Amino acid sequence: MKNNKIYINKKILLKLSGECLKKGKKNLVDFDILNKITNEIKNLFNLGIQIGIVIGGGNLFRGSQLKIHGIKRNIGDHIGMMSTLINGLFIYNHFERLNIKSQLISPFPFNINGICESYNIFRINKILKKKIVIFCFGIGHTLFTTDSAACLKAIEIDANLLLKITNVDGVFSEDPAKNPNATLYKKISYDYALKKNLKIMDFTAFAIAKEHKLPIRIFNIKEPNSLYKAIIGKDIGTLIN
């Protein structure tokens, strides 16, 4: 793609759930899906878009769900945070194969031979001008989701838009898997989402986004060129503002 357009969103934060990387119950990381996602991100980066990614770990372990196995919540959350690092390394490796520079960032002192470094709010925007930034470990504390981390990082890097990549077409009035007649919302407010208790993000994430007027677009990564459509303002998925 040639950079001959004026883009509405020149700095974005992608929230990529771990669930988006898996296919079925056996393939915890599906490499066809990973290839598609990283290639679409590469195309945006080559257009001059600054990109931060907050990666989840739900395809491997979800801390809140480990208590049924007798694992304490705080330990489970740390296991979940380590899962985000594993997913981050997969993404980092795929960017390397595509000759795209990226940097893993940890919210606490943590280093893997220069691949991962600790977060520095004063350096992060300099890194974003040269590399794709992959935020691992959420916000680095238990009891907080990676959705909350995505909203927080989007605000800290002064992103124009938060894009939440999912396996569904957007936000529905009900679970479309249970009710095929559920309505797809094209545009809703934070207040409406909270009032209707729509299971999009947790309350903390919404509170952060609402306070800072951060627009969020939620869409299905399976749609061709979905990321490109989102940054040029196409009416894709659901917009929350």
From Swiss-Prot:
<feature type="binding site">
    <location>
        <position position="166"/>
    </location>
    <ligand>
        <name>ATP</name>
    </ligand>
</feature>
<feature type="binding site">
    <location>
        <position position="172"/>
    </location>
    <ligand>
        <name>ATP</name>
    </ligand>
</feature>
<feature type="binding site">
    <location>
        <begin position="139"/>
        <end position="146"/>
    </location>
    <ligand>
        <name>UMP</name>
    </ligand>
</feature>
<dbReference type="GO" id="GO:0006225">
    <property type="term" value="P:UDP biosynthetic process"/>
</dbReference>
<dbReference type="GO" id="GO:0044210">
    <property type="term" value="P:'de novo' CTP biosynthetic process"/>
</dbReference>
<dbReference type="GO" id="GO:0005524">
    <property type="term" value="F:ATP binding"/>
</dbReference>
<comment type="similarity">
    <text>Belongs to the UMP kinase family.</text>
</comment>
<keyword id="KW-0963">Cytoplasm</keyword>
<dbReference type="GO" id="GO:0033862">
    <property type="term" value="F:UMP kinase activity"/>
</dbReference>
<feature type="binding site">
    <location>
        <begin position="15"/>
        <end position="18"/>
    </location>
    <ligand>
        <name>ATP</name>
    </ligand>
</feature>
<keyword id="KW-0418">Kinase</keyword>
<comment type="pathway">
    <text>Pyrimidine metabolism; CTP biosynthesis via de novo pathway; UDP from UMP (UMPK route): step 1/1.</text>
</comment>
<dbReference type="Pfam" id="PF00696">
    <property type="entry name" value="AA_kinase"/>
</dbReference>
<feature type="binding site">
    <location>
        <position position="58"/>
    </location>
    <ligand>
        <name>ATP</name>
    </ligand>
</feature>
<feature type="binding site">
    <location>
        <position position="57"/>
    </location>
    <ligand>
        <name>UMP</name>
    </ligand>
</feature>
<dbReference type="InterPro" id="IPR001048">
    <property type="entry name" value="Asp/Glu/Uridylate_kinase"/>
</dbReference>
<keyword id="KW-0808">Transferase</keyword>
<dbReference type="InterPro" id="IPR036393">
    <property type="entry name" value="AceGlu_kinase-like_sf"/>
</dbReference>
<keyword id="KW-0067">ATP-binding</keyword>
<dbReference type="GO" id="GO:0005829">
    <property type="term" value="C:cytosol"/>
</dbReference>
<feature type="binding site">
    <location>
        <position position="62"/>
    </location>
    <ligand>
        <name>ATP</name>
    </ligand>
</feature>
<comment type="subunit">
    <text>Homohexamer.</text>
</comment>
<dbReference type="InterPro" id="IPR015963">
    <property type="entry name" value="Uridylate_kinase_bac"/>
</dbReference>
<feature type="binding site">
    <location>
        <position position="175"/>
    </location>
    <ligand>
        <name>ATP</name>
    </ligand>
</feature>
<protein>
    <recommendedName>
        <fullName>Uridylate kinase</fullName>
        <ecNumber>2.7.4.22</ecNumber>
    </recommendedName>
</protein>
<keyword id="KW-0547">Nucleotide-binding</keyword>
<keyword id="KW-0665">Pyrimidine biosynthesis</keyword>
<comment type="function">
    <text>Catalyzes the reversible phosphorylation of UMP to UDP.</text>
</comment>
<feature type="binding site">
    <location>
        <position position="77"/>
    </location>
    <ligand>
        <name>UMP</name>
    </ligand>
</feature>
<feature type="binding site">
    <location>
        <position position="167"/>
    </location>
    <ligand>
        <name>ATP</name>
    </ligand>
</feature>
<dbReference type="InterPro" id="IPR011817">
    <property type="entry name" value="Uridylate_kinase"/>
</dbReference>
